[in-house]
Amino acid sequence: MSEIKRLEINYKTDELFENFRAFGNKDLYMVNELNGQMIDASSDSPFYGIFVGDQLGARMALLKKGDVEEIYFPDFEDYILLWKLEVLPKYQNRGYASELIDFAKSFNMPIKAIGRNDSKDFFLHHGFTDVEAKNIEGHDVLLWKP
């Protein structure tokens, strides 16, 4: 099992994200998210990653939502939005994405995920439910409940 590290909100993390901009999927860049966090000077970073040697090979953001969407989670006061999970191509098929999902589940809170880039089946395989709804960008909305 890999060590999942919280990534600090700083320019070093921006440099680590550079490989994802060069080789990753354009829809998953997280440039605006990181820059927004740096501007807000938020103390709690929502970014997590798995390093392979000194390279960031997989990453995601876990955003806590205080205002629960009653339509999805009527029995919970809070939930996590799993945002833009991505593994660089040369590190795929090593279980890193599954480890990030398990890490998100370890918070024992409901999780809402957006199925981008044909990832719907991946989330379904990990116990998420398809609510047969789309977000404003047209991507599938999937849920996991503890």
Curated annotation (Swiss-Prot):
Its EC number is 2.3.1.-. The keyword Nucleus does not apply. PROSITE patterns: GNAT. GO terms for molecular function: acyltransferase activity, transferring groups other than amino-acyl groups. Keywords: Acyltransferase, Transferase. It is an enzyme of class 2 (transferase). Residues 7-146 form the N-acetyltransferase domain. It comes from the Bacteria. This is Uncharacterized N-acetyltransferase SAB1040c.
